UniProtKB/Swiss-Prot annotation:
<protein>
    <recommendedName>
        <fullName>Activin receptor type-1-like</fullName>
        <ecNumber>2.7.11.30</ecNumber>
    </recommendedName>
</protein>
<dbReference type="GO" id="GO:0001525">
    <property type="term" value="P:angiogenesis"/>
</dbReference>
<dbReference type="InterPro" id="IPR003605">
    <property type="entry name" value="GS_dom"/>
</dbReference>
<keyword id="KW-0732">Signal</keyword>
<dbReference type="GO" id="GO:0005886">
    <property type="term" value="C:plasma membrane"/>
</dbReference>
<feature type="modified residue" description="Phosphoserine">
    <location>
        <position position="160"/>
    </location>
</feature>
<feature type="modified residue" description="Phosphoserine">
    <location>
        <position position="161"/>
    </location>
</feature>
<feature type="topological domain" description="Cytoplasmic">
    <location>
        <begin position="142"/>
        <end position="503"/>
    </location>
</feature>
<keyword id="KW-0479">Metal-binding</keyword>
<keyword id="KW-0067">ATP-binding</keyword>
<comment type="function">
    <text>Type I receptor for TGF-beta family ligands BMP9/GDF2 and BMP10 and important regulator of normal blood vessel development. On ligand binding, forms a receptor complex consisting of two type II and two type I transmembrane serine/threonine kinases. Type II receptors phosphorylate and activate type I receptors which autophosphorylate, then bind and activate SMAD transcriptional regulators. May bind activin as well.</text>
</comment>
<dbReference type="InterPro" id="IPR001245">
    <property type="entry name" value="Ser-Thr/Tyr_kinase_cat_dom"/>
</dbReference>
<keyword id="KW-0812">Transmembrane</keyword>
<feature type="region of interest" description="Mediates specificity for BMP ligand">
    <location>
        <begin position="73"/>
        <end position="76"/>
    </location>
</feature>
<dbReference type="GO" id="GO:0098821">
    <property type="term" value="F:BMP receptor activity"/>
</dbReference>
<feature type="disulfide bond">
    <location>
        <begin position="90"/>
        <end position="95"/>
    </location>
</feature>
<keyword id="KW-0723">Serine/threonine-protein kinase</keyword>
Amino acid sequence: MTLGSPRRGLLMLLMALVTQGDPVKPSRGPLVTCTCESPHCRGPTCRGAWCTVVLVREEGRHPQEHRGCGNLHRELCRGRPTEFVNHYCCDSHLCNHNVSLVLEATQSPSEQPGTDGQLALILGPVLALLALVALGVLGLWHVRRRQEKQRGLHSELGESSLILKASEQGDSMLGDLLDSDCTTGSGSGLPFLVQRTVARQVALVECVGKGRYGEVWRGLWHGESVAVKIFSSRDEQSWFRETEIYNTVLLRHDNILGFIASDMTSRNSSTQLWLITHYHEHGSLYDFLQRQTLEPHLALRLTVSAACGLAHLHVEIFGTQGKPAIAHRDFKSRNVLVKSNLQCCIADLGLAVMHSQGSDYLDIGNNPRVGTKRYMAPEVLDEQIRTDCFESYKWTDIWAFGLVLWEIARRTIVNGIVEDYRPPFYDVVPNDPSFEDMKKVVCVDQQTPTIPNRLAADPVLSGLAQMMRECWYPNPSARLTALRIKKTLQKISNSPEKPKVIQ
């Protein structure tokens, strides 16, 4: 996306909201029926508080027009059109059906009106005075920056200056900023001032997910898609914890969700907590498995990459580019994302626990939220877990990893047979099981998910089935480690008689 002259500064995008389907919590007033034309529509029409039309042009693409219903943040309807985004809101039946929008044209230098000599004579002294004032302000700014450098802020201001300069020149920024994203720890989050700059340039495009703890939106930053997780006010501790971990721990890894920025913003007189990360259009592994059946080689690709991510979290890396050991504490298929290359990456570190052998300090954080009951290990359900022992938290991750393996195996085709997607323990607990429901099944009855007999007919899935059993040992210390799971899966993928995992 070309931003034009450096004098134009940073482009600030405003977008209207387009929701999918019928609203859950509409605004006040009667609902209207609207034409719905977007990738997330459930039908040709939807019902909402008002109708919307959004015209957006992303980098390297033709403008695309989306129609749908609006329910939240009506104030965004008053945004002015730009050369990249235009939107329209209305309140009557199917009022957005025949509406067509155009983007604001960029005025070329040849179209700009000239100034005559008399105007130049008048403006000359004024511009000279403004230049002197600007020089004075620049001098004061240099003095201020020198003072801030002494307080340890020089590096952050330098990074912020670089991002502003690059934005003015129209460079592709996201790849440049995150160029250090590699398979080993190579840097924590961006400097705080850069994060705030990035966060305030993001325009929300569409809501792609909702949960008890907030919403996930696809946003645009300089024409590139990013994911914006907006935390609800009651889950502030999860936002704070995840921000803290990303900004203090060297977590760059192919199989850990890439962090971009975190910021506390004000929208419509209310505070919003944003976490901005890489965007993966396939969504979570939970969503992917519901709509996609797997060949054995793809199932192995997903499991190997998920194991690599978990092993990277669990291991402590020493040295200047090191990291403490981290236990996830809420590992599940909804918190694993599927990338465009069909590898997995682990997300949601809001409950993570950190431990460093050097200081022997266990950093549990201060979050009242608990993990997902369906994926809780037996020692958590019967409250026998040693909360002062870091290994205990890693063992609970392994139990949950075995359940995710089971979800993948059910959706893998063997001899033309495959089961529908089901969550773990679907046949013995309700859709939203209580703590007592899970405790009875897992601790009292000592049940584990039933492994289909057909898995024994495939060399890959038979290995996965055995691995599941070793992840579900009642004795936590007897379970496999994440590193052993990773190496075993890699050995299966590299075995000549097994299907190869395509790299």
